[in-house]
Swiss-Prot record:
UniProt subcellular location: Cell membrane
Annotated protein name in UniProt: Tetrahydromethanopterin S-methyltransferase subunit A 2
Binding site residues for 5-hydroxybenzimidazolylcob(I)amide: H84
UniProt record similarity statement: Belongs to the MtrA family.
Ranges per topology, Cytoplasmic: 1-38
NCBIfam families linked: mtrA, PRK00964.1-4
Cofactor binding, per record: Binds 1 5-hydroxybenzimidazolylcobamide group.
Length: 193
Protein backbone atom coordinates (compact mmCIF):
# COMPACT_ATOMS: atom_id res chain seq x y z
CA UNK A 1 0.00 0.00 0.00
CA UNK A 2 1.20 3.51 -0.83
CA UNK A 3 2.37 5.77 2.00
CA UNK A 4 -0.31 8.09 3.34
CA UNK A 5 -0.28 11.29 5.40
CA UNK A 6 -2.87 12.93 7.61
CA UNK A 7 -5.14 15.46 5.98
CA UNK A 8 -5.64 18.92 7.41
CA UNK A 9 -7.87 19.00 10.46
CA UNK A 10 -11.56 19.08 9.52
CA UNK A 11 -10.85 18.16 5.88
CA UNK A 12 -12.33 19.22 3.50
CA UNK A 13 -11.37 22.67 4.73
CA UNK A 14 -13.69 24.67 2.44
CA UNK A 15 -17.43 24.14 2.21
CA UNK A 16 -19.03 23.27 -1.08
CA UNK A 17 -21.33 21.02 -3.08
CA UNK A 18 -19.42 17.74 -2.96
CA UNK A 19 -19.42 14.17 -1.67
CA UNK A 20 -16.55 13.10 0.59
CA UNK A 21 -15.23 9.57 0.28
CA UNK A 22 -12.04 8.00 1.64
CA UNK A 23 -9.60 10.84 2.55
CA UNK A 24 -6.69 8.49 1.82
CA UNK A 25 -7.80 8.01 -1.79
CA UNK A 26 -5.42 9.61 -4.31
CA UNK A 27 -8.28 10.87 -6.52
CA UNK A 28 -10.36 14.05 -6.54
CA UNK A 29 -13.01 14.51 -9.23
CA UNK A 30 -14.58 17.71 -10.50
CA UNK A 31 -17.73 17.06 -12.49
CA UNK A 32 -17.80 20.65 -13.80
CA UNK A 33 -21.40 21.54 -14.82
CA UNK A 34 -22.69 17.98 -14.36
CA UNK A 35 -24.23 16.61 -11.18
CA UNK A 36 -23.03 13.02 -11.31
CA UNK A 37 -20.60 13.23 -8.38
CA UNK A 38 -22.10 10.07 -6.89
CA UNK A 39 -20.42 8.01 -9.65
CA UNK A 40 -16.78 8.90 -8.85
CA UNK A 41 -17.51 8.88 -5.11
CA UNK A 42 -18.81 5.30 -5.36
CA UNK A 43 -15.73 4.36 -7.41
CA UNK A 44 -13.41 5.42 -4.58
CA UNK A 45 -12.65 9.13 -5.01
CA UNK A 46 -11.63 11.12 -1.92
CA UNK A 47 -13.90 13.98 -2.94
CA UNK A 48 -16.17 14.61 -5.93
CA UNK A 49 -18.45 17.45 -6.92
CA UNK A 50 -19.32 20.05 -9.54
CA UNK A 51 -17.37 23.26 -10.07
CA UNK A 52 -19.09 25.94 -12.09
CA UNK A 53 -16.95 29.06 -11.73
CA UNK A 54 -13.43 29.76 -12.89
CA UNK A 55 -12.61 31.89 -9.83
CA UNK A 56 -14.13 31.10 -6.41
CA UNK A 57 -15.07 27.58 -7.55
CA UNK A 58 -11.53 26.76 -8.62
CA UNK A 59 -10.17 28.35 -5.44
CA UNK A 60 -12.34 26.04 -3.32
CA UNK A 61 -11.26 22.94 -5.23
CA UNK A 62 -7.57 23.92 -5.01
CA UNK A 63 -7.88 24.64 -1.27
CA UNK A 64 -9.44 21.23 -0.60
CA UNK A 65 -6.87 19.39 -2.72
CA UNK A 66 -3.71 20.94 -1.30
CA UNK A 67 -4.97 20.42 2.26
CA UNK A 68 -4.93 16.67 1.58
CA UNK A 69 -1.47 15.45 0.47
CA UNK A 70 -2.93 12.02 -0.37
CA UNK A 71 -4.71 13.46 -3.43
CA UNK A 72 -2.43 12.96 -6.44
CA UNK A 73 -4.94 13.04 -9.32
CA UNK A 74 -7.65 15.51 -10.30
CA UNK A 75 -10.08 14.14 -12.87
CA UNK A 76 -11.98 16.82 -14.81
CA UNK A 77 -15.15 15.31 -16.24
CA UNK A 78 -18.73 16.21 -17.00
CA UNK A 79 -20.07 18.98 -19.19
CA UNK A 80 -17.89 22.06 -19.64
CA UNK A 81 -19.41 25.15 -18.05
CA UNK A 82 -20.58 27.53 -20.77
CA UNK A 83 -19.21 31.07 -20.46
CA UNK A 84 -17.02 30.27 -17.47
CA UNK A 85 -15.10 27.52 -19.29
CA UNK A 86 -14.09 26.14 -15.88
CA UNK A 87 -12.47 22.92 -17.13
CA UNK A 88 -10.19 24.79 -19.52
CA UNK A 89 -9.36 27.23 -16.69
CA UNK A 90 -8.31 24.31 -14.45
CA UNK A 91 -6.06 23.02 -17.22
CA UNK A 92 -4.55 26.47 -17.76
CA UNK A 93 -3.88 26.91 -14.03
CA UNK A 94 -2.24 23.49 -13.85
CA UNK A 95 -0.13 24.00 -16.99
CA UNK A 96 0.67 27.74 -16.79
CA UNK A 97 -0.08 29.03 -13.30
CA UNK A 98 -1.21 32.61 -12.91
CA UNK A 99 0.13 36.14 -13.00
CA UNK A 100 1.68 36.70 -9.55
CA UNK A 101 0.32 40.24 -9.23
CA UNK A 102 -3.05 40.23 -11.01
CA UNK A 103 -3.74 36.54 -10.20
CA UNK A 104 -5.24 35.98 -13.66
CA UNK A 105 -4.92 32.36 -14.77
CA UNK A 106 -2.45 32.39 -17.65
CA UNK A 107 -4.05 31.13 -20.86
CA UNK A 108 -7.56 30.72 -19.42
CA UNK A 109 -10.40 31.64 -21.77
CA UNK A 110 -13.22 31.89 -19.21
CA UNK A 111 -15.06 35.10 -18.39
CA UNK A 112 -13.31 35.97 -15.09
CA UNK A 113 -10.39 33.53 -14.59
CA UNK A 114 -8.82 34.96 -11.44
CA UNK A 115 -7.65 33.06 -8.35
CA UNK A 116 -7.22 36.09 -6.14
CA UNK A 117 -7.41 34.21 -2.82
CA UNK A 118 -4.82 31.57 -3.68
CA UNK A 119 -1.25 32.67 -2.94
CA UNK A 120 1.46 31.66 -5.41
CA UNK A 121 2.60 29.03 -2.91
CA UNK A 122 -0.84 27.41 -3.23
CA UNK A 123 -0.83 27.56 -7.05
CA UNK A 124 2.63 25.97 -7.18
CA UNK A 125 1.61 23.28 -4.72
CA UNK A 126 -1.47 22.46 -6.85
CA UNK A 127 0.76 22.11 -9.93
CA UNK A 128 3.31 19.91 -8.16
CA UNK A 129 1.05 17.70 -6.05
CA UNK A 130 -1.11 16.11 -8.71
CA UNK A 131 -1.60 14.89 -12.22
CA UNK A 132 -4.53 16.42 -14.09
CA UNK A 133 -6.72 13.94 -16.00
CA UNK A 134 -8.76 15.53 -18.80
CA UNK A 135 -12.15 13.91 -19.37
CA UNK A 136 -13.96 17.20 -20.02
CA UNK A 137 -17.38 16.70 -21.66
CA UNK A 138 -17.41 13.01 -20.73
CA UNK A 139 -20.43 12.06 -18.60
CA UNK A 140 -20.18 8.29 -19.17
CA UNK A 141 -20.42 6.66 -15.74
CA UNK A 142 -18.51 3.56 -16.81
CA UNK A 143 -15.61 5.57 -18.22
CA UNK A 144 -15.45 7.82 -15.14
CA UNK A 145 -15.52 4.81 -12.79
CA UNK A 146 -12.77 3.09 -14.79
CA UNK A 147 -10.57 6.21 -14.70
CA UNK A 148 -11.00 6.64 -10.93
CA UNK A 149 -10.02 2.99 -10.40
CA UNK A 150 -7.07 3.33 -12.80
CA UNK A 151 -5.76 6.34 -10.86
CA UNK A 152 -6.17 4.49 -7.55
CA UNK A 153 -4.06 1.65 -9.00
CA UNK A 154 -1.34 4.15 -9.98
CA UNK A 155 -1.29 5.79 -6.50
CA UNK A 156 2.26 7.12 -5.99
CA UNK A 157 1.65 7.72 -2.28
CA UNK A 158 1.19 10.98 -0.45
CA UNK A 159 2.87 14.17 -1.64
CA UNK A 160 6.13 14.69 0.26
CA UNK A 161 5.00 17.93 1.93
CA UNK A 162 2.36 18.19 4.65
CA UNK A 163 -1.09 19.70 4.18
CA UNK A 164 -1.22 23.32 3.06
CA UNK A 165 -4.33 25.06 4.34
CA UNK A 166 -5.75 28.10 2.59
CA UNK A 167 -8.70 29.71 4.29
CA UNK A 168 -11.10 31.45 1.94
CA UNK A 169 -13.48 33.89 3.59
CA UNK A 170 -16.39 33.79 1.17
CA UNK A 171 -18.15 36.72 2.84
CA UNK A 172 -15.09 38.87 2.34
CA UNK A 173 -14.34 37.41 -1.09
CA UNK A 174 -14.57 40.77 -2.81
CA UNK A 175 -11.87 42.12 -0.49
CA UNK A 176 -9.47 39.58 -1.97
CA UNK A 177 -7.73 38.50 1.22
CA UNK A 178 -6.51 35.06 2.10
CA UNK A 179 -4.76 33.35 4.93
CA UNK A 180 -2.33 30.53 4.44
CA UNK A 181 -1.23 28.13 7.12
CA UNK A 182 1.20 25.31 6.67
CA UNK A 183 0.18 22.45 8.94
CA UNK A 184 3.82 21.61 9.55
CA UNK A 185 4.71 25.14 10.54
CA UNK A 186 1.65 26.84 12.11
CA UNK A 187 2.64 30.18 10.60
CA UNK A 188 0.04 32.43 9.11
CA UNK A 189 0.64 34.65 6.14
CA UNK A 190 -1.83 37.26 5.03
CA UNK A 191 -1.66 38.15 1.36
CA UNK A 192 -3.49 40.95 -0.36
CA UNK A 193 -4.08 40.25 -4.03
Amino acid sequence: MADKKPTAENWPVVSGDYIVGDPESPVAVTTLASHNEDIPAAAGAAIAGPCKTENLGIEKVVANIISNPNIRFLILCGAEVQGHITGQSFKALYENGCDPEKKKITGATGAIPFVENIPMEGVERFQQQLELVDMIDNEDGGAITAKVKECIEKDPGAFEEDSLVIKIDEERYSKKSSFVESSSESEKIESEA
